[in-house]
Swiss-Prot record:
UniProt family annotation: Belongs to the class-I aminoacyl-tRNA synthetase family. IleS type 1 subfamily.
Domain of life: Bacteria
Keyword Protein biosynthesis carried by entry: yes
Cofactor-binding details, from the entry: Binds 1 zinc ion per subunit.
Enzyme class, spelled out: ligase
Quaternary data: Monomer.
Annotated protein name in UniProt: Isoleucine--tRNA ligase
PROSITE patterns: AA_TRNA_LIGASE_I
Length: 959
């Protein structure tokens, strides 16, 4: 007896060197090396045919390691840039760094021994700060590159370079010459712990701050003319009640403000609450205050607020008299007494009211937060420590204290030192927003805000904001280029002085301000008077630094443009960089520096908690990429999985990350990779020039698949155009799993493996696989850039493009659009799903192993549908196009369309549904040794007695 033949060498199995495992830790850097060596980004950014596209980088702070917020932000930017490159745009991305300011100064000071700090000059400190910033910038740049981010890494922008600083001085100068810059004694957010003024964006409001709040009464000594008749009967024993959460500001009290629209009451208290039998409060609050003070308050008279204006009271702690004044709509009955203690040196609203009434700006507090001699008996006490209690005790002694109680509220802290700030009037430099507020609000309307609520956030911020305090009392920053007359203290700030300093800084950097003599810093016409001047020691707010980047980078670099296409940062930047950039750009040029602003949320842990060292829930992007110390618990996922996470989340709100999420994403990544590997493996012998099958010759299944490809990649394109990357993620994942792996490729194996190499049946399928693999590589390239390039480099045929990024975006042909196929193939896919359920039932009960062991019976009641199915079920496997057949659709050896439900009911395994009823029985005939299908023809071919008619034909090139 002869040995049965082996047919394994006659089957076309997949062949590819594209690895099933990504091995990202090793492979991704190799791909990045390929991009660098071949200047892929540089070539495309210069040679692409379409318009220039500029996403302008908001500079991260050159301070510390990269965190998940950086990873989210930089990856979002890179996804957009890579998509625009694939669409043929010239994309120039210049990464930037914010290098000045207090946080860096603090890091440097913390690293120094106390004796080192003793002899520290501004220049020594600046050099150390510069070294620290540059070292951090280099480390961060390496991290960003490892994420796969493309950009002009050799030529980033740093806010500490001479050309940047000079452009910033230019912005300041233009604003000064337009009258928008002024010096004033005004209350600003002051950080005693940092000893400098702070901008709104440098504050944070932690939960759980408790202040000691007080109610106090000030003695009324003289009535206003209009209120005389009502007040005089009570005047000998009358107080006006105020409430404050900052008792330390009482030494600065110069007025009490009321709301002219409110009605006020004179109430009597008889329980020795304070020294005054009668007190004035808002009429609406009498009941609430009775409860607060735990004493009966009896209304003796009421009067409109307006007539109390100019009533005079005496300060309970000092020998000075002040007036009751009309405040703004901030005086309400929501809390307090309806009358507001007003200290123009300690509050923005107080200051505005004080200006209206010509009040002094009194702020008896020094840089460290200690009372000065102006505060009298409290001199030397610290306002955030012992001053509050001392003042409360003194009010008690004077019989003015009505009540003290702890008050939990939001209070501004210094974002770096994490310590409370105060409002304190100091001589500062301001940008007067009033001068260009309307223009800024108009500019906001011209911008495309994504998501749209971004506009609703920034509009009230700009419309309500006070003037911008731009001076800082620190050394590490760009100097405010002003000189002061030694005798009069008057500032010298002219076009000539600004231009001269700007030219010096452009050559020598801002150290020159500290290095050169006054004579050298002054222009020619002022040199002879140099001895009369001293240089200013203030530096500019870092938000003015980064807020000038449109001028120092976008406008100044030839390869860029202004306004730019897009700014993209976290939602906290509505009060930070988006706003400072808008204000400077509008002040100087009357336009917004950006056309679109896109914002993202913050990164939280898997439980939705903020990440913090104390909670131990910090996720480190480099650990995601390279793995942690324990690689079982923290495996190395590579940059692409991190990037896939970025594309999977709805970044418009806060986004979670953690090991469970990463594991799920890693599974999705692997599915996409395995799909690509199958496609590549089955194209190993395909030469597109010779083997492509024309569209009209393709079986209907393939035409349907090209239609699906059109639908899928139209959706993906729309997702990228609208920056909705989570739609890309869902669509591509679904396409790879549902359309390809579970459907088309599952059916395709029979065509690809057992047909003759050159058969139409096989080449038509490969024609679709080529479209699928190239479309997939291009579409995932903005996100999974390393995998996309890897796929492209393993294409088994020649292409004219060195890199996937040079190949352009997904191309779809008009003729592939066949919506009518969606309906008919939708039904066929439904039949496949129903059949699979019954096959699974038979498999579970061990009636069959593979689905090829089965014959499937189908019954449909709809006659038209039955006709369609009959055309998909020829009697002879070698007739028709050998693809559009029910047996291949359901992967069974035979399919029979039966005329009645009875036949189905006789089957061993069955199911009924509205569309189709399914029965499964054992397949007829014998199993073919080559394709494992059952056939009644096995044994009919004397040379090959163990194979079926299809395989017999395939071996001679006819199937």
């Amino acid at each position: 007896m002869t040995e049965p033949k082996s047919y394994k060498d006659t089957v076309n199995l997949p062949q590819t060197d594209f690895s099933m495992r990504a091995n990202a830790v090793q492979r991704e850097p190799e791909i990045q090396q390929f991009w660098t060596e071949n200047c892929i980004y540089e070539q495309l950014s210069q040679n692409n045919p379409e318009d220039l596209f500029i996403l302008h980088d908001g500079p991260p702070y050159a301070n510390g390691s990269l965190h998940m917020g950086h990873a989210l932000n930089k990856t979002l930017k890179d996804i957009i840039n890579k998509y625009k490159l694939l669409r043929g745009h010239k994309v120039r991305y210049v990464p930037g760094w914010d290098c000045h300011g207090l946080p860096i100064e603090l890091k440097v000071l913390q690293s120094m021994k106390s004796e080192e700090r003793e002899g520290l000059t501004p220049l020594k400190l600046r050099r150390k700060a510069r070294d620290f910033a540059l070292k951090t910038q280099q480390e961060q740049a390496e991290g960003f590159k490892r994420y796969g981010v493309w950009g002009d890494w050799e030529n980033p922008y740093l806010t500490l370079t001479p050309e940047y600083e000079a452009a910033q001085i230019g912005v300041f100068g233009q604003m000064a010459l337009k009258g928008y810059i002024y010096r004033g004694l005004k209350p600003v957010h002051w950080s005693p712990s940092s000893r400098t003024a702070l901008a709104e964006a440098e504050l944070e409001y932690p939960e759980g701050h408790t202040s000691q709040s007080i109610f106090a009464a000030f003695p009324i000594i003289k009535s206003s003319k209009d209120a005389q008749e009502i007040l005089d009967p009570f005047l000998s024993n009358l107080g006006v009640a105020i409430w404050t959460t900052t008792p330390w500001t009482l030494p600065g009290n110069l007025a009490v403000a009321l709301n002219p629209e409110l009605t006020y009451a004179i109430v009597e208290q008889t329980s020795n609450l304070c020294n005054y039998q009668y007190i004035i409060v808002a009429a609406d609050l009498v009941e609430r205050l009775s409860a607060t003070f735990s004493t009966e308050l009896t209304v003796k008279a009421t009067l409109p607020g307006q007539i109390l204006e100019h009533t005079i009271y005496r300060h309970p702690l000092y020998d000075r008299e002040s007036e009751i004044v009309i405040g703004g709509d901030y005086v309400t009955t929501e809390s307090g007494t309806g009358l507001v203690h007003t200290a123009p040196g300690h509050g923005q609203e107080d200051y505005i009211v004080g200006q209206r009434y010509g009040l002094q700006v009194l702020s008896p507090v020094d840089d460290a937060g200690n009372f000065t001699e102006e505060a009298g008996q409290f001199s030397g006490l610290n306002v955030l420590k012992d001053a509050n209690q001392a003042i409360i005790n003194e009010l008690k002694n004077k019989g003015s204290l009505l009540k003290e109680e702890p008050y939990l509220h939001k209070y501004p802290y210094d974002w770096r030192t994490k310590k409370p700030t105060i409002f304190r009037a100091t001589e500062q430099w301001f940008a007067s927003v009033e001068g260009f507020r309307e223009a800024a609000l108009e500019a906001i309307k011209s911008v495309n805000w994504i998501p749209p609520q971004g506009e609703n956030r920034i509009t009230p911020m700009v419309s309500d904001r006070s003037d911008w305090c731009i001076s800082r009392q620190r050394s590490w920053g760009v100097p405010i280029p002003v000189f002061y007359n030694e005798e009069t203290n008057e500032p010298l700030l002219t076009e000539e002085t600004i231009n001269h300093v700007q030219a010096i800084i452009a050559k020598q950097g801002s150290d020159a301000w500290w290095e050169l003599s006054i004579e050298e810093l002054l222009p020619e016409q002022y040199k002879k008077d140099a001895h009369k001047y001293r240089r200013g020691t203030d530096t500019m707010d870092v938000w003015f630094d980064s807020g000038s980047s449109w001028a120092a980078v976008a406008k100044q670099r030839e390869e860029l443009k202004y306004p730019v296409d897009i700014y993209l940062e976290g939602s906290d930047q509505h009060r930070g960089w988006f706003q400072s950039s808008l204000l400077t750009s509008v002040a100087v040029n009357g336009i917004a520096p950006y056309k679109t602003v896109l914002t993202h949320g913050f990164v939280l842990d898997e439980k939705g908690h903020k990440m913090s060292k104390s909670l131990g829930n910090i996720v480190d992007p480099l650990v995601i990429i390279n793995g942690g110390k324990n690689q079982k618990q923290e495996p190395p996922y590579g940059a692409d999985v991190l990037r896939l996470w970025v594309s999977s989340v709805d970044y418009s709100s806060d986004v979670p990350i953690g090991q469970t999420i990463l594991k799920q994403l890693s599974d999705v990544y692997r599915k996409i990779r395995n799909t690509a590997r199958f496609l590549l493996g089955n194209l190993h012998d395909f030469d597109p020039e010779k083997d492509t099958v024309s569209y009209d010759q393709l079986p209907e299944l393939d035409q349907y698949m090209l239609h699906r490809i059109t639908e899928v990649f139209t959706e993906v394109t729309d997702a990228f155009e609208k920056f909705q990357f989570f739609r890309f993620f869902q669509t591509v994942q679904n396409f790879c799993v549902v359309d390809l792996s579970n459907f088309y490729l599952d059916i395709a194996k029979d065509r690809l493996y057992i047909s003759d190499t050159n058969s139409l049946r096989r080449r038509s399928c490969q024609t679709v696989l080529k479209v699928a693999v190239e479309s997939l590589a291009k579409a995932i390239a903005p996100v999974l850039c390393h995998m996309a390039e890897d796929i492209w480099q393993f294409l088994p045929y020649k292409t004219p493009y060195q890199s996937v990024f040079a190949s352009g975006w997904v191309e779809m042909q008009k003729q592939w659009e066949r919506p009518e196929l969606t309906a008919s193939w939708g039904k066929l896919r439904q039949i496949r799903t129903e059949v699979n359920k019954v096959l699974e039932q038979a498999r579970n009960e061990k009636a069959i192993g593979s689905s090829l062991d089965a014959k499937v019976l189908l019954y449909v009641s709809d006659q038209d549908f039955k006709k369609q199915l009959e055309s998909f079920n020829p009697n002879d496997s070698l007739k028709g196009n050998q693809v559009d057949e029910l047996r291949y659709l359901v992967l069974a050896s035979q399919v029979e369309l039966v005329d009645s439900l009875e036949a189905i009911k006789k089957a061993d395994y069955q199911s009924e549904s509205e569309l189709v009823s399914v029965g499964v029985v054992k397949a007829e005939g014998q199993k073919c040794d080559r394709c494992w299908n059952y056939s009644t023809k096995v044994g009919e071919f004397s040379d090959d007695p163990t194979i079926c008619e299809r395989c017999n034909a395939a071996l001679v090139g006819e199937f």
